[in-house]
Amino acid sequence: MNLCLCGWYFHPPLIAALVASKYPSVWVCHREPPKTFPLRYASGPNVGLEFGAYDQYLQHEWKAGPVVLLHDDTEITEDALDAISQMTVDQAFLFASAADAEANGKAHGRAMFCSDKFLTRLKTDGGFWYSEDPCDGKPIPATTANVPDYHNAGIQVFRAYLESLPKEFTVNRVAIVPGLRTGYRGRL
């Protein structure tokens, strides 16, 4: 199993956990990490929020095997990763608790598991959809009556894609993972 982290917070507890982990990881970031950064990384344009970063990983870094996709404002234990590595579904949204899953509508881009079979199909179908707007590198604005909901467009399109897959794919699942804690915009 491989890990793909996206973000630019470079959360120190997560870095320490991944340095000690047996699971290989790639950090997809939109700015260069600190000079002493001990992990493999790929930097690219800041477009598409997490789905843009996940697509960059899928198109340029992923070779084969299942992957855990995570925001970098996350804490996760090796026991949690071991449990995730035993998953037999093709795709699952990962949550710390049932209450966390309910609060997020049972879907989010902060943490998910994807099988090799699923990622192969997704890559064949063109990869993760993401909105390039606004594509000027500026922070994505808050949703208002005059500004589109950039923050939720990716997950809405992703869920529609999951629902379009043949029944042979076990997707759109929820997994409760003790030892996982996801943050929000750099805050845990």
Listing of model-derived features with the role each one plays in the protein:
Residues 1-188:
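ER/Golgi luminal nucleotide-sugar-dependent glycosyltransferases, focusing on the catalytic module
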